């Protein structure tokens, strides 16, 4: 047990009171990003150190490792707290996304330390996909670089609206205010070109020395703003998913015995309640929620982000990949969509290629009909392109093999986000965010021709192993 936790337990009167308080603290997910050697891992190590989140054995090991592998002379190399891979320690860089957890009296945090090297940009995008805030580090000696712009754009593309620009290594320029202000103006000029409105906070700091990280440093009397930790503890993040219409992608059909059939998954948006009428898509069948089951007991309602198992009143044909929505909501099935793509493999993306696509629990296939443009990261302008290279970002049009229920990524990242999977190697090669669903192919149940209904009945009767659904919504 570290000293900070021990002190909180003592102050709150025991372990149970401490755990109860932890459950009711808000959770903030943030990532550190930016160019290589800007000090991302050192900053996280400093946060953990100054908030007393390091255990005694970890601190002892850190002293030993700093002498053997450290790059800071006689000082503790705090980056070693985060860089756990042998290759990371040997090269002094971050390769994989490293997650760390800590808490203060005001909030709980999950940190994603992401790599700055261009070849690991895909790892950075992975880390950003679940975060609320991005800490963008800038080396005060180098200013705004290409990777700074790239990581800023990817963060906004993935829905992050709060950026903290941490101008690091101020100790190496004698804490010069003019240099800091120059970088601030350069970044603001760049940010004006980003496609969304952002909440941007600038903090000058020294991760190595600790100035303005968890406490204000005396070396910068000209700075009268908050520390980095103050920003993280007070930033207001609104869970927009709770305000959206209900979405429940089915991940797994839970059938432990003949007396129980439940549909497991995470509520992607909105709220679901016992007694609520829901519609199953794509079949269109309706039923009512009879139970909301969790490991800790039944709930009366489940909000966005909660993992639950739903039990319905009726025996309904539901499988992995189906979507449960409110019964009164009319959704449109589409077979084409405009999708923002971050390409993650050395083999370029070209029009005409087909991929396996995974959206929430559903796996399907899609073809890239065309690449509408590629984004020039330096200028954020659009340019004509017939392919997307590794780390390329662009807008493509996808044609799915079957009608799909899609939301815009900005409205719902779960039902509007996807990954591209190579059909031969089964490797994830890209990430996609639905910009705009296209081509209405929706038909109300019953709006089928006589021939279609007869063919559907024939297939279901003689070829049940094909898994065809009843177009009339029956079993």
Curated annotation (Swiss-Prot):
| Pathway(s) per entry | Sulfur metabolism; hydrogen sulfide biosynthesis; sulfite from sulfate: step 1/3
Any coiled-coil regions, as ranges: none
Question: What CDD domains does this protein map onto?
Answer: CysN_ATPS, CysN_NodQ_II, CysN_NoDQ_III
Q: Which residues bind GTP?
A: 34-41, 113-117, 168-171
Q: What is its EC number?
A: 2.7.7.4
Look up the signal peptide feature and give its range: none
**What gene name is given for the protein in this entry?**
cysN
The record's region (G1) falls at 34-41
Q: Which domain of life is it from?
A: Bacteria
What is the reaction catalyzed?
Answer: sulfate + ATP + H(+) = adenosine 5'-phosphosulfate + diphosphate
> Which stretches does the entry tag as region G3?
113-116
- Give the disulfide map: none
Role: With CysD forms the ATP sulfurylase (ATPS) that catalyzes the adenylation of sulfate producing adenosine 5'-phosphosulfate (APS) and diphosphate, the first enzymatic step in sulfur assimilation pathway. APS synthesis involves the formation of a high-energy phosphoric-sulfuric acid anhydride bond driven by GTP hydrolysis by CysN coupled to ATP hydrolysis by CysD.
Renumbered to this chain, region (G2) spans 92-96
In its UniProt entry, what is this protein called? Sulfate adenylyltransferase subunit 1
List, in alphabetical order, the GO biological process terms annotated in this UniProt record: hydrogen sulfide biosynthetic process; sulfate assimilation
What is the similarity comment for this entry?
Answer: Belongs to the TRAFAC class translation factor GTPase superfamily. Classic translation factor GTPase family. CysN/NodQ subfamily.
Q: Where is this region: G4?
A: 168-171
The record's keywords, sorted A to Z, are: ATP-binding, GTP-binding, Nucleotide-binding, Nucleotidyltransferase, Transferase
């Amino acid at each position: 047990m570290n000293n900070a936790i021990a002190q909180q337990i003592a102050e709150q009167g025991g372990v149970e009171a401490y755990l109860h308080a932890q459950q009711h603290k808000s959770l903030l997910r943030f990532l550190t990003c930016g160019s290589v050697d800007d000090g991302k891992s050192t900053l996280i190590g400093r946060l953990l150190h100054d908030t007393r989140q390091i255990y005694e054995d970890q601190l002892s090991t850190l002293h030993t490792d700093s002498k053997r592998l450290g790059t800071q002379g006689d000082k503790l190399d705090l980056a070693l707290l985060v860089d756990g891979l042998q290759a990371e320690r040997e090269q002094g860089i971050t390769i994989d996304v490293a997650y760390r957890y800590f808490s203060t009296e005001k909030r709980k945090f999950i940190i994603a330390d992401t790599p700055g090297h261009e070849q690991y940009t895909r790892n950075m995008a992975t880390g950003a996909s679940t975060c609320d805030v991005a800490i963008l580090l800038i080396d005060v000696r180098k200013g705004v670089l290409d990777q700074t712009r790239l990581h800023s754009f990817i963060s906004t593309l993935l829905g992050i609206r709060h950026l903290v620009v941490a101008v690091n290594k101020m100790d190496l320029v004698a804490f010069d205010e003019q240099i800091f202000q120059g970088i601030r103006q350069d970044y603001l000029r760049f940010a004006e070109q980003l496609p969304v409105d952002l909440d941007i906070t600038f903090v000058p700091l020294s991760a190595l020395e600790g100035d303005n990280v968890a406490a204000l440093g005396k070396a910068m009397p000209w700075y009268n703003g908050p520390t980095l930790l103050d920003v993280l503890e007070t930033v207001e993040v609104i869970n927009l998913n709770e305000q959206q219409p209900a979405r429940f992608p089915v991940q797994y059909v839970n059938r432990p015995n003949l007396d129980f059939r439940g549909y497991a998954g995470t509520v992607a948006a909105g709220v679901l309640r016992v007694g609520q009428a829901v519609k199953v898509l794509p079949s269109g069948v309706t039923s009512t929620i009879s139970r909301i089951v969790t490991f800790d007991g039944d709930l009366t309602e489940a909000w966005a982000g909660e993992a639950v198992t739903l039990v319905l009143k009726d025996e309904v044909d539901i499988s992995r990949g189906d979507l449960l929505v409110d019964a009164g909501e009319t959704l449109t099935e589409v077979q084409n969509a405009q999708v923002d793509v971050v390409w993650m493999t050395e083999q370029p993306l070209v029009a005409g290629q087909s991929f396996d696509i995974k959206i929430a629990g559903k796996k399907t296939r899609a073809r890239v009909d065309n690449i509408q443009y590629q984004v020039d990261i330096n200028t954020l302008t659009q340019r004509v392109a017939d392919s997307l290279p590794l780390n390329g970002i662009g807008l493509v049009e996808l044609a799915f093999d079957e009608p799909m229920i899609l939301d815009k990524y900005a409205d719902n990242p779960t039902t509007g986000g996807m990954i591209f999977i190579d059909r031969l190697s089964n490797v994830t090669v890209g990430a996609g965010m639905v910009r705009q669903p296209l081509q209405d192919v929706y038909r109300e149940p019953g709006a089928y021709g006589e021939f279609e209904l007869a063919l559907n009945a024939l297939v279901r009767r003689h070829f049940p192993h094909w898994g065809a659904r009843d177009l009339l919504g029956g079993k």
